[in-house]
């Protein structure tokens, strides 16, 4: 467990439970977010305790106790690079320090610093401008990095189709004009068509697991030049993904660098909110609103039109799913679609495993600011109830 967690502990003293729980919550959310593990034996779970006797966790004391490990770190310089947010505060400094300490403890290399003048930013822009069928491949790492808002700005300025990973379907609204589907084994046909026909892929926030690239991974993105950004350097070296330009960096930093560079180039984006028909109008191509000018599709369509065509023609939801009598069971795809359409913007939906997770990820109509939270790693039964409590 130690090698895959930020902190792990078996609780043997019932009176330490408050301290350990508070420590885990603080550590998992501070610095680079990551898992913490508490092993609580059943006899400890059944012990009676007095709340007044429990000692809490003090983050400042924890930092003081770890000063020996941090005494060689140039705190201001390193932490600013690791916590690239709009405003830099003391809490951000602590986050950056903990990132460094954790990586040194586990022998992990530091992600590189990226800004608008970095060569990789120019390379990405050059390849998108030259591409005929580019795709922006996104994952939940964008949200973990706190970059979901800047991602939408960058996507609008780039103007290329966006596909979403299994655990990131809520990173972009369903009706967003650039959304092109969900690739992977549990994704949909439009998303897989887009990836397999792409000639350039920019992947940010996704580790491109087997669930995303498939077991026949040698044919994944068969014609695409790929730029892959990951905060874990080892993810960029695995044999199941071909990476032409690996970017070992924080997702926020790369997106911020792209945003700044596109601003410098005078590219402001279309500003067309969730209107696919309006975006596809020919007068928008080449007007400087976005970096990409439409590209090449099939049968007289450009690339944006081609992806929009696939989204409509090969949607996992079909109209006949609604064709049933009142005394017949509802189709699960129809149920999920209607449920999602009845929800308001910025509402949170948490699902368990099985059809709720798989069908939900395929047909859920994500609205502006809404969340769709599912358990995507180890398929634990019963995840939905505690997750829903946490989401509230």
What residues fall within each predicted segment?
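Glycine-rich, acidic loop regions that bind phosphate or pyrophosphate groups
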Residues: 1-18, 54, 63, 77-79, ...
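General beta-strand structural signal in soluble alpha/beta enzymes
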Residues: 10-12, 38-40, 137-138, 163-165, ...
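Conformationally flexible catalytic loops at phosphate/diphosphate-handling active centers
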Residues: 27-127, 271, 286
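Glycine-rich phosphate/diphosphate-binding loops that line cofactor/substrate pockets in enzymes
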Residues: 27-32, 120-136, 154, 195-197, ...
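Glycine-rich beta-alpha junction loops
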Residues: 40-46, 140-142, 233, 353-356
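Glycine-rich, anion-gripping cofactor-binding loops and their flanking helix/strand elements
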Residues: 140-227, 357, 363, 367-391
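Active-site diphosphate/adenylate-binding microenvironment
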Residues: 308-391
């Amino acid at each position: 467990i130690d090698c895959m967690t930020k902190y792990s502990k078996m609780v043997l003293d019932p009176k330490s439970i408050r301290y350990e729980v508070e420590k885990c919550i603080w550590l998992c959310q501070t610095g680079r977010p990551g898992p913490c593990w508490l092993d609580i034996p059943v006899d400890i779970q059944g012990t009676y305790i007095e709340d007044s006797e429990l000692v809490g966790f003090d983050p400042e004391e924890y930092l003081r106790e770890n000063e020996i490990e941090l005494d060689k770190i140039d705190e201001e310089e390193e932490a600013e690079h690791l916590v690239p947010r709009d405003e830099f505060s003391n809490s951000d400094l602590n986050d950056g320090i903990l990132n460094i300490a954790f990586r040194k403890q586990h022998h992990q290399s530091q992600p590189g610093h990226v800004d608008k003048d970095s060569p990789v930013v120019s390379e990405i822009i050059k390849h998108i401008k030259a591409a005929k069928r580019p795709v922006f491949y996104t994952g939940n790492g964008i949200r973990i990095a706190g970059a979901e808002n800047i991602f939408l700005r960058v996507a609008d300025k780039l103007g290329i189709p966006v596909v979403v990973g299994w655990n990131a379907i809520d990173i972009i609204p369903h009706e967003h004009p650039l959304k092109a589907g969900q690739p992977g084994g549990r994704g949909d046909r439009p998303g897989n068509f887009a990836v397999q026909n792409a000639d350039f892929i920019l992947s940010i926030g996704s580790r491109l697991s087997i669930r995303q690239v498939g077991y026949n991974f040698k044919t994944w993105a068969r014609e695409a030049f790929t730029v892959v950004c990951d905060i874990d350097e080892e993810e960029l070296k695995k044999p199941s993904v071909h990476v032409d330009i690996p970017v070992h960096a924080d997702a926020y930093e790369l997106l911020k660098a792209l945003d700044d560079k596109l601003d410098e180039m005078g590219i402001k984006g279309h500003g067309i909110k969730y209107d696919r028909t309006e975006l596809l109008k020919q007068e928008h191509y080449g007007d400087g609103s976005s970096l990409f000018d439409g590209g090449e599709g099939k049968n007289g369509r450009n690339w944006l039109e081609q992806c929009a065509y696939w989204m409509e023609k090969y949607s996992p939801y079909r109209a006949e799913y609604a064709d049933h009598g009142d005394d017949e069971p509802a189709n699960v795809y129809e149920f999920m679609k209607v449920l999602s359409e009845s929800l308001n913007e910025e509402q949170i939906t948490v699902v368990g495993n099985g059809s709720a997770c798989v069908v939900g990820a395929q047909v859920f109509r994500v609205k502006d600011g809404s969340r769709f939270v599912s358990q995507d790693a180890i398929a634990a039964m019963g995840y939905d109830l505690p997750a829903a409590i946490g989401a509230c």
